[in-house]
Amino acid sequence: MLALYQPDIPQNCGTMLRLCACLGVEAAIIEPAGFPVSDRHFRRAGMDYLDQVALSRHVSFTAFRAWQIETGRRLVLLSTKASQPYTDFTFRPDDILLMGRESAGVPEAVHASADARVVIPLRPPMRSLNVAVAAAMVLGEALRQVGALAKVMDAPRASL
């Protein structure tokens, strides 16, 4: 699952949901988002793929965290403050990859509540990648590790 913490740029959110649709990954939006889901930029970035995403919405991080604990899934935060490279981390099929806000990441309390934290190594003085690019990189590695990419490749293709 790819979870988006209070996304504030509709184009990035739409792009990440499109990524989830294409790879068969569940998605969650942790409210409040910085835009309505009817936003034209959000819909345009997601194109007609948004209807193909298994999407859940949570009214707050507290509600999301309660759901996450109840389901027993591990919360893996992608953070520029983490020390473990995502390529050295062992992902599990039921992991939830949490992406922070484009403008501010996540608050310290959310950071501390994650079961694990991973980082994409960048050369100095670069600070971060676009959140949708970062999500694609780490989600791709997680799916590769758990063998889920092969399932995507074996799935029947939609007709044009």
From Swiss-Prot:
Q: Which family does it belong to?
A: Belongs to the class IV-like SAM-binding methyltransferase superfamily. RNA methyltransferase TrmH family. TrmL subfamily.
Cell compartment(s), UniProt: Cytoplasm
The free-text function statement in the UniProt record for this protein reads: Methylates the ribose at the nucleotide 34 wobble position in the two leucyl isoacceptors tRNA(Leu)(CmAA) and tRNA(Leu)(cmnm5UmAA). Catalyzes the methyl transfer from S-adenosyl-L-methionine to the 2'-OH of the wobble nucleotide.
Q: List the InterPro entries hit by this protein, alphabetically.
A: Alpha/beta_knot_MTases, SpoU_MeTrfase, TrmL, tRNA_m1G_MTases_N
The UniProt entry, under PANTHER family, shows:
TRNA (CYTIDINE(34)-2'-O)-METHYLTRANSFERASE (PTHR42971:SF1)
Keyword list (alphabetical) reads: Cytoplasm, Methyltransferase, S-adenosyl-L-methionine, Transferase, tRNA processing
Q: In the record, which residues are listed under signal peptide?
A: none
Catalysed reaction, written as an equation? cytidine(34) in tRNA + S-adenosyl-L-methionine = 2'-O-methylcytidine(34) in tRNA + S-adenosyl-L-homocysteine + H(+); 5-carboxymethylaminomethyluridine(34) in tRNA(Leu) + S-adenosyl-L-methionine = 5-carboxymethylaminomethyl-2'-O-methyluridine(34) in tRNA(Leu) + S-adenosyl-L-homocysteine + H(+)
Write one Pfam family the protein is assigned to.
SpoU_methylase
List the taxonomic lineage. Bacteria, Pseudomonadati, Pseudomonadota, Alphaproteobacteria, Hyphomicrobiales
Q: Which GO terms describe its cellular component?
A: cytoplasm
Superkingdom per UniProt: Bacteria
The protein's name is tRNA (cytidine(34)-2'-O)-methyltransferase
Enzyme Commission code(s) on record: 2.1.1.207
Question: Which amino acids does the record list as binding S-adenosyl-L-methionine?
Answer: 78, 100, 120, 128
Give the intrachain disulfide bonds: none
Q: What Gene Ontology terms describe what this protein does at the molecular function level?
A: RNA binding; tRNA (5-carboxymethylaminomethyluridine(34)-2'-O)-methyltransferase activity; tRNA (cytidine(34)-2'-O)-methyltransferase activity
Query: Tell me, how does this one assemble?
Result: Homodimer.
